[in-house]
Structure formats: C-alpha cells, structure tokens
C-alpha cells in the first residue's frame, strides 16, 4: 500500500487570536481571554491568548481562575498586568474560519480536507507533494504562511504517515517544541519516531481519544503510558483485559498504542452513519427549579423540531437527560430531603444521579404537537420535582430524510389534516425567521419566567453570536 502523508493544522488560540487581530493587537503578545463576563465568574473561558497562557492559565480556565491568577501575578510586578475580557462572537469566528478554509482550497481539493472543528483540519497531502514538487514541511509552511499573511493568525501543525500520527505530532510533539518568530510550530513523525519519542510520554490523556475515564481504568491496572499498552497487548491475558474493559474501542486503543491508524481520508469522505440524531444541550447559568426546567425543555424541543422541518427530516424517538445541581447534596436542608443515589459530576463534585429517559412517537414525524407532547410527558415522568436542575440535553433519534421515510398507513386516531395545517405553520415560521431573525416570531412560553429562548436565539453554539 502506498505510504501517505497527512497534515493536522490547529489555529493557535483561535477565538482569542481573532479578537486580538480585530483590535489591532499582536495575538502572541496581547493579554486577552474570550469569556462572557455578563454570566458569572464561573463561566468557562473559550480561549486564552498565548501570552496569558505563559503565566500558567489554562486554555479552558474559568473566569474566576483567571482573575485570581492575575491577582497573584500582580503581587510580584511593579507594573500591573492588565488583560482584556472579550465577549464571544461566534458568528465572527465562523466567518474567519470560512475565510481560512478558502485559503486551504487554494492549494488542496475539498476531497482531501476534513474539517475537524472550527479551528482544526486534517489534510491528505500525498498527491500534492508531487504536484508542488516539495516536501510535507514546505507545503505545511506555505499553508500556514498564507493564513498568517491573510488573517494575522498563526498555527501549529503535525505531519504523519497516518491521521493519528499527524494529530499526535501536532498535539504533543509540536506543542512542546520551540516556535519560530511567528509562533509557528511544525513537527513530523512516523511510527518509529512515535515509539521512540512518545511511548513513555505522560500524562496519557495528552493522546487523542484518551479521556480521564479511560486513563483511570488503565492506571487501576498499572498502565500509565502508550508503550505499556503496546507491550501488554502482545500477551493474550492483557489483550483479553483490554477488550473486556473497553469493548470494541480496545482495538483502536491498541492500534494507537503502536502508532497505527487504518482510517484514511477516503474512508472519512465515504462514511455515512447508520442512524442519525439531532440534539440540543444547555448548561444553565444558575440552578433551575423543576418547573423552570420544564420550560427550558419545551423551548429546546420546539427549536429542534423547527430544525427538523428546515432540513426536511423526521424522527421517531426523543431522549432526555437531566443533570442536577450540586447544591442538592451540599446544602444541608436540601440534603436532608434527598434520599436518592449520589454520583460525581464531570468535575468530581457530588451531585444527585442524573435522570434519563426516552419516548417513542409511534411514527416518523416532525410535528411540534406530537414531539412536544411526548417530551413533556417524558420530563414529568423522569424529573425529580424537588431537585434543582443545572444541565439539560434533548436528543431526537433515528432521524431520516423525509423522502426516505417509509410510508405509514393512516389511522382513525391521528388528525392528518391538523398535522398538515401545523406543517404549513412551521414553514411560515421558518420563512419569517429567515427574513427577519430568529426572534421575529415567538411563543408565549418564550416569555415565561426562566425562559431562555430569546437569549439562545441570539447565540451560536450556546455563546454570543
């Protein structure tokens, strides 16, 4: 099989860099965080400029952590460090991301680019090395220099013989190497480099697709490095342990430990999921009562259904996840009333066990009436009315295009004419929203106490547009 060359390119502190450039500041020298200070100081920073990161502030710190760290820094400085807190502008970041994607298209076909996130791409550069008569490092620098000249934003890149090695070269090797004068870091590795340089690297969570849960289970078995996974995988007893502990993911874990990755760019482009879903999630700015949480779920469902209609899709199931606030178990009075199981949340804090449930609609549908009715019944069935809610997730499952949905025999219990009228109303609502904005037409539920629909309509991905 032909050896291939892959690039992974990550725009450096992308959101922060956009804010710096738009203010005429040097992204590498300015002190800036992207965070919505209007919420609370507990809000997570979406980005931190490299100059602030150099003081030990993490890229996903909470705003109060930034405030505390800067106070500590200023105690030992004659001139106080001053920084900018920039509110998120998601629409602007997406605009710049599209501009940068157009730069990639000047050199690379869309068939050989996989957009991994708003600030990160994978590129199969194999055929372009011959086309441009250059090596992978030269091509990578050409792309990054064009991005820098056009947008003022720099990048970090990894080059590898497969997608995994390109990603690891970028995430670990490049980010621990010295930058050039423009802050650019590029590293290149093959399988043997990977084993030599990274088999003993810690923490293991630095590696792509290894989260804290996986690392914890590995450490309980005495495994702390990728090299140890590779060596243990040669023994039948250990191989059995991996598959028993991680299921089908064990195969990928072992492959990655050896620096192997069978997936190619062509595989990514050919992939079509067997089933699909649409989902919406909200982390609430403060703990919500059950009654207020019910309003939020109603709003989320109605927006998801409009998304179905706009995309000409149908769903047949809804799944609801309710995550409760930690104060339900830390507040003495509330703790007395709660007798249910306690688990640890994402941050390791004690909280009531989340509620989870699903409802089938009995048909493929995009009816707001049918789906909202099922959602409210589900919420009432699984939500604990005495607990405060902090996070909600709603998922519409088994989504298919309307033209691929199997026909359904009409029955005496469904008002097909009413569903048709509702569909025309949905189409009208979408047309008004397209012309005049998402808040041009609202429902009564959007004005109830605790509702966030109007605010969410002005956001992209849960952040200010």
Give short role names for the model-derived ranges.
Residues 143-202:
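Long, highly charged, low-complexity intrinsically disordered interaction regions
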Residues 117-124, 161-166, 232-233:
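Short, conserved phosphate-binding/catalytic loop or strand-edge motifs used
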Residues 1-118, 122, 255-257:
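Residues that scaffold, gate, or flank divalent-cation-dependent active/transport sites
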Residues 161-164, 255-258, 314-326, 388-400, ...:
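A glycine-rich phosphate-binding loop feature that marks nucleotide/adenosyl-phosphate handling sites
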Residues 8, 206, 216-388, 407:
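DNA-contacting surface of Y-family translesion DNA polymerases
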Residues 18, 348-465:
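Acidic, metal-coordinating catalytic segment for phosphate/diphosphate chemistry
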Residues 122-144, 219-222, 234:
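Catalytic palm subdomain of template-directed nucleic-acid polymerases
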């Amino acid at each position: 099989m032909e050896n291939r060359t892959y690039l992974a390119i990550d725009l450096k502190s992308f959101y922060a860099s956009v804010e710096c450039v738009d203010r005429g500041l040097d992204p590498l020298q300015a002190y800036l965080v992207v965070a919505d200070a209007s919420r609370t100081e507990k809000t997570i920073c979406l980005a931190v400029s490299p100059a602030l990161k150099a003081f030990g502030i993490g890229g996903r710190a909470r705003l109060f952590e930034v405030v505390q760290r800067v106070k500590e820094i200023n105690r030992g400085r004659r001139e106080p460090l001053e920084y900018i807190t920039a509110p998120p502008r998601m629409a602007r970041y997406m605009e710049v991301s599209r501009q940068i994607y157009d730069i990639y298209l000047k050199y690379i076909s869309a068939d050989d680019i996989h957009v991994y996130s708003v600030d990160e791409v994978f590129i199969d550069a194999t055929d372009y090395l011959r086309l441009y008569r250059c090596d992978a490092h030269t091509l990578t620098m050409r792309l990054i220099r064009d991005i820098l000249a056009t947008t003022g934003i720099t990048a970090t890149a990894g080059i590898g013989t497969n997608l995994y090695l390109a990603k690891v070269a970028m995430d670990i090797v490049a980010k621990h190497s010295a930058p050039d004068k423009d802050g650019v870091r590029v590293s290149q590795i093959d399988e043997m480099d990977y084993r030599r340089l990274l088999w003993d690297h810690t923490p293991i969570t630095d590696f792509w697709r290894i989260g804290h849960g996986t690392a914890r289970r590995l450490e309980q078995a005495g495994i702390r490095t990728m090299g140890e996974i590779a060596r243990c995988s040669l023994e039948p007893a250990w191989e059995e342990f991996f598959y028993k502990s991680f299921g089908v993911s064990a195969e990928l874990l072992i492959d990655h430990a050896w620096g192997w990755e069978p997936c190619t760019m062509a595989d990514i482009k050919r992939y079509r999921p067997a089933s699909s879903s649409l989902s919406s999630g909200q982390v609430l700015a403060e703990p919500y009562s059950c009654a207020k949480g019910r309003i939020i779920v109603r709003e989320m469902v109605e927006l998801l259904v409009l998304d179905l209609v706009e995309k000409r899709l149908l769903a047949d199931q809804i799944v609801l996840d309710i995550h409760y606030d930690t104060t339900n178990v830390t507040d003495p009075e509330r703790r007395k009333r709660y007798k249910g199981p306690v688990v640890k949340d994402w941050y390791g804090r004690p909280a009531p066990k989340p509620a989870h449930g699903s409802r089938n609609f009995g048909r493929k549908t995009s009816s707001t009436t049918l789906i909202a009715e099922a959602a409210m019944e589900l919420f009432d069935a699984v939500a604990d009315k005495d607990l405060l809610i902090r996070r909600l997730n709603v998922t519409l499952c088994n989504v298919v295009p309307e033209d691929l949905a199997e026909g359904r025999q009409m029955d005496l219990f469904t008002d097909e004419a009413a569903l048709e009228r509702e569909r025309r109303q949905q189409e009208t609502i979408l047309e008004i929203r397209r012309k005049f904005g998402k808040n041009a037409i609202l429902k009564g539920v959007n004005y109830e106490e605790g509702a966030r629909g109007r605010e969410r309509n002005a956001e992209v991905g849960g952040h200010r547009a």
